[in-house]
Amino acid sequence: MLKDELLNQYITYIYSCSCAETLVKSGVKPTMTAGYSMGIYASLYIAGSVSFETGLLFIRKAYEAIRGSLPHDKFGMGGVIGLSEKDIRDITDHHNLDIVMVNRNSDHSFIVAGSSFHINLFLLKSREEGALHARSLGVTIPYHTSHLSEAANKLSETVYSADVVDPETPIISVLGQDLILDAGRARKEVVNNIHTPFNWLATQLQMFNSGIRIFTECGPSQALRKNSKFIPGSGKFVKWVNLVRKDRDGLMR
């Protein structure tokens, strides 16, 4: 299972970098980038902070650090849509669940992580409470939780010795919504990302408040574009392929 998760991260990274590169080569350059969860690596690459190879290195070293510090089958993650933060905390507290809310996509869309048994129980109770959607994310790693603190320390050995430079394009942190403008801050984000909860809702709203109105998702999923419909006043998401500038013959540049 873990090897499949590593392969999926490689594929997603390569796809995301390819999409973003296609846009840039056609003349569409980002004002700002943001990395949703493990999207931090592609975000750093397209911002010019790391090479493509360094991004792959970070993914592999993070996987190896996690593999060396966690049991393979005792953790998981889940997504729930249709409940409030209070609903989720009430379920967690009432059933004494060993889970953590690790991301808020919108006011009624959340990601949780923790014990696989408790994740499954949480999803069951969420459906009973009226959640519109509650499912396992199919991973065995509790990303963005303190369970990965040891792995983060191990990963830092690679990150702080790797070639990382100041980003050419500002990167907004999904952890704290501040701008990542230098190499030191970029390194810190990579290390903290795997064991710290993030907030996509706050991140997208911060980008909107900074003047950005057009967003695109460079990856195989359209989840963020769909999610944006539930964030009032957050700008417009456009499919990346629809933003690619074309030549007179209608071909991508």
Q: Locations of the language-model features?
A:
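Short acidic/polar active-site loop segments enriched in Thr and Asp
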Residues: K29-T31, L132, R213-I214
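Short acidic, glycine/proline-enriched helix-loop-strand junctions
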Residues: A223-R253
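Gly/Ala-rich beta-loop-alpha elbow adjacent to hydrolase catalytic centers
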Residues: S16, T31, G35-G39, S43, ...
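A short, acidic, amphipathic alpha-helical segment used as a generic capping/interface helix at domain edges
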Residues: I194-I212
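Helix-rich "cap/lid" substructures immediately adjacent to catalytic or cofactor-binding pockets
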Residues: M1-A34, V112
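Conserved small-residue
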Residues: S16, G39, V80, V112, ...
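Alpha/beta catalytic cores of group-transfer enzymes, especially the acyltransferase/condensing modules
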Residues: A47-H195
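Non-catalytic positions within long, well-ordered alpha-helices that form the structural scaffold/packing
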Residues: V24, R127, F208-N209
